[in-house]
UniProtKB/Swiss-Prot annotation:
GO molecular function, one term: metal ion binding
GO biological process terms held by the UniProt record: CTP biosynthetic process; GTP biosynthetic process; UTP biosynthetic process
Alphabetical list of InterPro entries matching this protein: NDK-like_dom (IPR034907), NDK-like_dom_sf (IPR036850), Nucleoside_diP_kinase (IPR001564), Nucleoside_diP_kinase_AS (IPR023005)
PANTHER family the record matches: NUCLEOSIDE DIPHOSPHATE KINASE, NUCLEOSIDE DIPHOSPHATE KINASE DDB_G0292928-RELATED
Record-annotated active site: 117 (pros-phosphohistidine intermediate)
Family matches, as PROSITE patterns: NDPK, NDPK_LIKE
Native species: Shewanella sp. (strain MR-4)
Residues annotated to bind ATP: 11, 59, 87, 93, 104, 114
Cross-referenced NCBIfam families: PRK00668.1 (NF001908)
Function: Major role in the synthesis of nucleoside triphosphates other than ATP. The ATP gamma phosphate is transferred to the NDP beta phosphate via a ping-pong mechanism, using a phosphorylated active-site intermediate.
This protein's name: Nucleoside diphosphate kinase
Cofactor: Mg(2+)
Organismal lineage: Bacteria, Pseudomonadati, Pseudomonadota, Gammaproteobacteria, Alteromonadales
Oligomeric form and interacting partners: Homotetramer.
Pfam families, A to Z: NDK (PF00334)
Amino acid sequence: MAIERTFSIIKPDAVAKNHIGAIYNRFETAGLKIVAAKMLHLTKEQAEGFYAEHSERGFFGALVAFMTSGPIMVQVLEGENAVLAHREILGATNPAQAAPGTIRADFAQSIDENAAHGSDSLESAAREIAYFFSAEELCPRTR
């Protein structure tokens, strides 16, 4: 098993409903360690930059508006097969299709406001981590 890092966002809908602690508990219970975290309110420019790969898709404007509608939590998670483990904890993108007990099944209302984001590959994780965190902000958890 490989120790990996992945990137995660707790989106404005889940932050507004005070689900941060419950979601962090899910990460830690699954063996993922939080090695960096911060709360921020994305600017339009930050959201457009982060989601640039979707800029030509019809939902881009609504996505940017949602992601700038309130504070978010961004975090870096570390653990065995972290990318896959995190995505399994999140559940399907559409909460109506997410397995019971997953973050999206338990905390999301719709496919548009689905509580959380997780990197889909190691390459995406590296890019997304670097978008929000400097190397100095990552704190390896060795104890």
